[in-house]
Amino acid sequence: MHLKSVAAAVTVGAAVLVGCESPVPNKRLDLSCAARAEGKTERRVCVDDIVSNMTLEQKVAQMIQGEIRDVTPQDVFEYGLGSVLNGGGAFPQENKYASVQDWVELADAYYSASVDTRGGGSGIPIIWGTDAVHGHNNVMGATLFPHNIGLGATRDPELVSQIIGATAREVKATGIDWIFAPTVAVAKDARWGRTYESFSSDPAIAASFVAPIVTAMQAEGIASTAKHFIGDGGTLRGDDRGDTSMPLDELVAIHGQGYVEAIDQDVMSVMASFNSWYGEKIHGNKGILTDLLRDEMGFEGMVVSDWHGVGEVKGCTNDDCAQAVNAGVDMLMVPTDWKSLYHNTLAQAKSGEIPATRIDQAVRNILTMKIRAGLFNRGLPSSLAAKYQDQIGHPDHRGIAREAVRKSQVLLKNENQRLPLSPSGTYLVAGPGADNIGQQSGGWSVSWQGTGNSNSDFPGGTSILDGIERQVSAAGGRVVRDINADADIDAAVVVFGETPYAEMQGDAYTVAWYDKRGERKLINALVEKGIPVVAVFLTGRPMWINDLLNQSDAFVVSWLPGTEGEGIADVLLRDANDAVQFDFVGTLPMPWPALDVNAADRDMPVDEFAFPIGYGLSVTQAPLWSALSEELIGADNSLDQEVFKGGPRGSWKLFTGDKSDWTVEVTSSIAQSSSGSVVVRAVDRVVQEDSRRFTFAESGGDLSLIYMQSEYPTDLTDLNEAGGALVVEFRVVEQPTATTTLRMDCKYPCSGEVTFTKVLLDAPLGEWTRKAIPTACFADAGLSLEQVNTAFVMATAGDLTVDITEIKLATAPAIRSIVSCADLVNDTALLN
């Protein structure tokens, strides 16, 4: 059904619903004061009056926040829900390419359902929250700015204020009211997968950006959220959702200063953190969420939980956690299980397990935020959004982003003042990141993890290659892409680095950077040819990369610059008259590691540094380079490769196929093969969308398949000699009804195939299982190990439903997980 039809159905169908049993006993409320209340006193009086007249069911409904993939406008009408959100990779109609109008229509549908009182509903407007963490990053065509780590390198809070204003206007264009930002984390261990969401590891630098952000966002009428309270950046080993153990005064001094700034600016909401403090989950810790945040720090706004965060509290589940409410959580972000959460919370409120006073205070906090955000006098979201339709990807916003990009670049090395380059020269521009807007944008870019994207998914954006080529061509110079091109190359600009990731999936065991796409081989070849190398390193954290720092003539830390790649060309190149266009002004927001791990204690962050916070050269500086040690202290795991972890990793891409089309790339949270014989859907194992469910349906005896493929073939010879294996962590939901095979390809038809049916049938139904299939088994079946471009193919002609959370190539799989090649044989007897 089209969204306009959904909205109409909600309104027209209301009269029919009057005679039905509604989950929420309805009571019409007088909300007139909410549209005119100004100042704290008036708001308090108004909110007290509204809450005193609400039913318990209406109150609990206000505390529930579901996700747009699991909440319909009809649900909002029937339950009177307080909020919805779109998580990373969630779109209207589950369409990655949803238009701005699609977003607005869905916002109108939710709003209309929430204020429709003809069935006796409360009429309280719903509020929609979104993770616009570096621009309106879920929306096609939006301006994507540098991630926070890059903004921290600019040391320019005023520029960041402009970025937030632009982001807020793009969010308003889609009818959304609330942004889950700023992240005020102080990242202390770069192994943490959310390091790039932190402005700095220095509490003072990180805090300096907070007040301008909150002020700019709320000045645009968008509710802001300081997150994640508290200690998310201080966990042991940098583990996302791990434990932060330090005295309370130290916790506040290091990880709390951003909240002090946010509270001073009357931030509307705070999000609870996934981490624990001394082993107790923050989501269930009253001492943190109430005693510290409210009583000591003076926060008066609304506390929202993180995605299924309540389910991590001891004794709780995603849909049952009185402890979180009693601890101080006002709104419960439970995307999928919100209905059972509503009923359980209501029962706990009725029994007194959650005191009535606590329920009332939570609802007061929610309604106060809604009044402050202007929801009661704003009307249909489309009425406001219409004024901002030209703001998505507006040229002014892209100009701000381009300025932020060039100011965020940090120059670590510039031998013989190699930079900036004359645009009239001839340059090789190479590396996997050169023409890859997705890689330069990082996580939280269209999709949650930032994977599954191509340049066409960023309309209006500019790759680094495009930016360089545009300026060089305009000055009469030349850009080539092939190292063997028939050209006298003046220098090579090599763009490389981390591939996109977000929380959990970005956690690392070391800060060493391992190339998986031949980057080191490329740079070595350039050095051997005597071609000067300008390295542009795309990264979400400081990393140990000493060998390439030593080899490069110039080394630029580009962070994750977003969609405006020409900002990098602005500092790499002189203007047409050979004058410096823009100098490098970026400085390190975090120290740059001299070691790959902490030499004394691997659980601790690296504590020896090559460059301190604040380091960054200008083009006029050329300090004598002192070679850095290239010795790894930690284990060299460079042969290991993560192929899939909740989604494709590195250069690997996920495809599905059947005889209608073998090459359907999976780029969103739900997809299917051309004929529908394979359906792919994101599911949660532990955290948001950390797994995929593959449902195969029998289709006349024809094969259907899923596979992981890369345009960069990998040589598995050394991994195989080290006893390596293809490791798959999976859960069988429905057992196979026909032979199921696993295959690795060396550019098909070169391949090696084994039968996987017995492994699937032997796996406990509904339980997670990890199995390691030796690469030798595939080699014995015909695989040429030198050029493997497809690491995993699962194929069957029957029914099968299997969840997969991880696929990796590993040198040291757990012995008990290893499958004997003898068990990967004919399965005819097993299926009869």
PLM segments and residue spans:
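Noncatalytic modules at the cell exterior or secretory-pathway interfaces
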Residues: 780-791
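Buried hydrophobic-core signal for structured, non-transmembrane domains
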Residues: 366, 428, 572, 726-730, ...
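Gram-negative bacterial Sec-dependent N-terminal signal peptides
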Residues: 1-20
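Glycoside hydrolase catalytic-domain context in secreted enzymes
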Residues: 20-651
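Extracellular ligand-binding interfaces
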Residues: 701-782, 796-815
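Activation corresponds to long, low-complexity, non-globular regions
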Residues: 635, 639-673, 815-832
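Short carbohydrate-recognition loop motifs
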Residues: 650, 669-708
